[in-house]
Structure formats: structure tokens, C-alpha cells
Regions:
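Residue(s) in the substrate-gating loop at a strand-loop-helix junction
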Residues: 142
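Conserved NAD(P)H cofactor-binding loop of Rossmann-fold oxidoreductase domains
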Residues: 90-95
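The beta1-alpha1 cofactor-binding region of Rossmann-like NAD(H)/NADP(H)-dependent oxidoreductases
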Residues: 41, 61-72, 104
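Active-site loop immediately N-terminal to the catalytic Tyr-X3-Lys motif
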Residues: 100, 149-153
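Substrate-binding pocket helix/loop in short-chain dehydrogenase/reductase
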Residues: 98-99, 106-109
Length: 158
């Protein structure tokens, strides 16, 4: 039996790339996945694939680059009667270019998603995991954080 069998796993940024692949793989390993991103069409497509595998998928559409979005997502998931055994903070993005070419809103949304919402979700779910007697948090990062990247100062620092 897989470690993930029966575990409820929340995956942010699940509409594409790493998050999409993680959701598929974890569902195949027996996890019940809770997927979130901005694009409902992609999440619904993924949920259909997961359900065809015989696993459960719960879809929550949320733009995690907005302030208070982590709290909103947490409350929606709780209201649906779901607990989270494993949180995978995968959502994130970067913009490249000279810092002076960005509007404040551009880098503020990047920092909100890559740092603040990630931290909010950890802060919200960690006490629940302690009460449950265990859990796990995986924060997906970028190699760009390990060394300076030209034209990506905000992304690299986040």
C-alpha cells in the first residue's frame, strides 16, 4: 500500500506543469487530491482524469496572487468538510526584465503568490496538522533562488 493511500493532499498551482503532474501521480498512488489554481477549465479537465483513475478530486478555483486568498481558500476547503494531510505549495511564477520596467502591481502579485500566500497557507494548516497528529508541507521552489539571475531579481528573491 502506498504512503499516499487515503491521504488528502492540497496542491496549489495544479492547472499546469509540476502541479498538474503531481496531482495525477498522487491520485494514482491513492491520494484524494484537492486542486486549486485560477483556471477552472484546466482544473476540471484534471479532475476528470483523476476521477477516471478511480480517485477523488476536489476543485477550488482561487487566484492566490491576491491578498487574503490563502485564508479564503482555507475557509472554502474547511466549509466543504475537508481536512488536509499534506499541503503542497506549488503555485508560483516569475517575470523577467529590468525592475524599473515593472509596475508595482506586477511584482506585488508575484511576491504575494510566491511568498505571502505560501506562508499564509503554512500558518493556517500547520495547527490543523498538529491536532490531527501529523501531516506534511512541501514548498516547491526554484533553482533561481540559489544564485543571482539577470533580469529576475524579484523572482529570484521570492
Amino acid at each position: 500500500m502506498s504512503f499516499y493511500q487515503g491521504k488528502k493532499v492540497l496542491i496549489t498551482g495544479a492547472s499546469a506543469g509540476i502541479g498538474y503532474a503531481l496531482a495525477e501521480e498522487l491520485a494514482q498512488l491513492g491520494a484524494e487530491v484537492i486542486i486549486t489554481a485560477r483556471r477552472r477549465d484546466r482544473l476540471d479537465e484534471l479532475a476528470g482524469k483523476i476521477e477516471n483513475l478511480g480517485a477523488k478530486a476536489h476543485v477550488f478555483v482561487e487566484d492566490l496572487s491576491l491578498p487574503e486568498s490563502g485564508t479564503k481558500l482555507y475557509n472554502q476547503i474547511k466549509s466543504a468538510g475537508l481536512s488536509v494531510d499534506i499541503l503542497i505549495n506549488n503555485a508560483g511564477y516569475g517575470r523577467w526584465g529590468e525592475l524599473t520596467s515593472f509596475e508595482r502591481d506586477d511584482y506585488a502579485k508575484m511576491l504575494q503568490l510566491n511568498v505571502t500566500t505560501l506562508t499564509d497557507l503554512c500558518h493556517l494548516y500547520l495547527p490543523d496538522m498538529v491536532v490531527q497528529g501529523g501531516g506534511g508541507i512541501i514548498n516547491v521552489g526554484s533553482m533561481a533562488s540559489l544564485s543571482p539571475v539577470p533580469y529576475a531579481s524579484v523572482y529570484s528573491s521570492s
